[in-house]
Amino acid sequence: MENSRSTLIIFFAYTTIILIGSINCRDNNNNNLVTNQSALFVFGDSVFDAGNNNYIDTLPSFRSNYWPYGQTTFKFPTGRVSDGRTIPDFIAEYAWLPLIPAYLQPSNGKNQFPYGVSFASAGAGALVGTFPGMVINLKSQLNNFKKVEKLLRSTLGEAQGKMVISRAVYLFHIGVNDYQYPFSTNSSIFQSSPQEIYVDFVVGNTTAVIKEVYKIGGRKFGFLNMGAYDCAPASLIIDQTKIGTCFKPVTELINLHNEKLESGLRRLERELSGFKYALHDYHTSLSVRMNNPSKYGFKEGKMACCGTGPLRGINTCGGRMGVSQSYELCEKVTDYLFFDHFHLTEKAHQQIAELIWSGPTNVTKPYNLQALFELN
């Protein structure tokens, strides 16, 4: 018995040394990283935000750095708009990358960026005029990426810096706030211009940023189309006379966006040599879970875990609208598709991430992210 115990101690000590050694190797040898791994650079909004809004001057409603956000995995609020990990966190795990940090996180070091970084900001849009001064819009996220690209070239050397950029995967989720903003501000934009023109601006700004990343050296891109946000808990309670009814004014915008995004990506594939992409049908993935939650292991597909009011669809989770404001929190978060009025639970994020990573072509096409990461 004593000999067995000694053998176990020696074994665990040995494996610990091996593990620590391998971590140190990865941290201290950028050449190995450049040779063997593709980085992950993340652009977008609250669906992808890893905590950038913690470090900008904005309203509490644009932050999630308070309890119960982060309760499941991290056990503290990180700024992610969920009870735990988000889609990029799982994608990084599947790609054997460390957790991708927020760009503005003070602890970031120059050795961290070769693995990738998240520029995403809750509330951000493709249009500069969406929640101006409150968020880091897509154009500003691009500018931050350009700073990282210069830093990579200066720290790794010109050739290796370019290699990180060319082998990296660039993940995008953007646009929903551009469609939400006019309604939340009672804008008359849709009275003065057709919806299709507005959608053209949103998708056009997105593709312009993609072209800029391509020009710098990016070749592999991942996208989520627009989810069924017209039927999220917050949307289901907009018409108080028809609780549970999707918000139809946004439905057409979402459908137009998804059509134009898909056709725009096909056009870029024809125009840009070496451009490869994965487009996940997030709209369908979300809709089927809303309408048939039990099939996917949920009990609630339309009520949020955290919030107040009908379906907990009012944005009060964690006291977002004021410290003294109360909110309700469900007992078992894994029963729920939505964590708050608009955002998914960690369990839901993992399911979606798996489809983006290795899903068949009827849900993620023409490549999935696993295939893109394996391309060099």
Curated annotation (Swiss-Prot):
Reported function: Involved in the resistance to the necrotropic bacteria Erwinia carotovora, probably via negative regulation of auxin signaling. Possesses lipase and antimicrobial activities, inhibiting germination of fungal spores (e.g. Alternaria brassicicola).
Question: Mind listing the GO molecular function terms for this protein?
Answer: lipase activity
- Tissue spec. comment: Expressed seedlings, roots and stems.
Pfam families named in the record: Lipase_GDSL
Q: Which Gene3D superfamilies match?
A: SGNH hydrolase (3.40.50.1110)
Where this protein primarily resides, as one coarse class?
secreted
Q: PANTHER family in the record, alphabetically?
A: GDSL ESTERASE_LIPASE 1-RELATED (PTHR45966:SF1), GDSL-LIKE LIPASE/ACYLHYDROLASE (PTHR45966)
UniProt KW Ribosomal protein keyword: no
Family according to the record:
Belongs to the 'GDSL' lipolytic enzyme family.
Q: Which PROSITE patterns does the entry mention? A: LIPASE_GDSL_SER
Taxonomy-wise, where does this protein's organism fall, top ranks first?
Eukaryota, Viridiplantae, Streptophyta, Embryophyta, Tracheophyta
Induction of synthesis? In roots, by salicylic acid (SA), jasmonic acid (JA), and ethylene (ET) treatments.
Residues carrying sugar = 36, 186, 205, 362
Return the protein name: GDSL esterase/lipase 2
Q: Which domain of life is it from?
A: Eukaryota
Any one Gene Ontology cellular component term annotated for this protein: extracellular region
Keyword annotations for this protein, in alphabetical order, are: Auxin signaling pathway, Glycoprotein, Hydrolase, Lipid degradation, Lipid metabolism, Plant defense, Secreted, Signal
A Gene Ontology biological process in which this protein takes part is: lipid catabolic process
What's its EC?
3.1.1.-
Please tell me which top-level EC class this enzyme sits in: hydrolase
Which compartments is it annotated to reside in? Secreted
InterPro entries referenced in this protein's UniProt entry, alphabetically: GDSL, GLIP1-5/GLL25, Lipase_GDSL_AS, SGNH_hydro_sf, SGNH_plant_lipase-like
Residues of the active site:
46, 340, 343
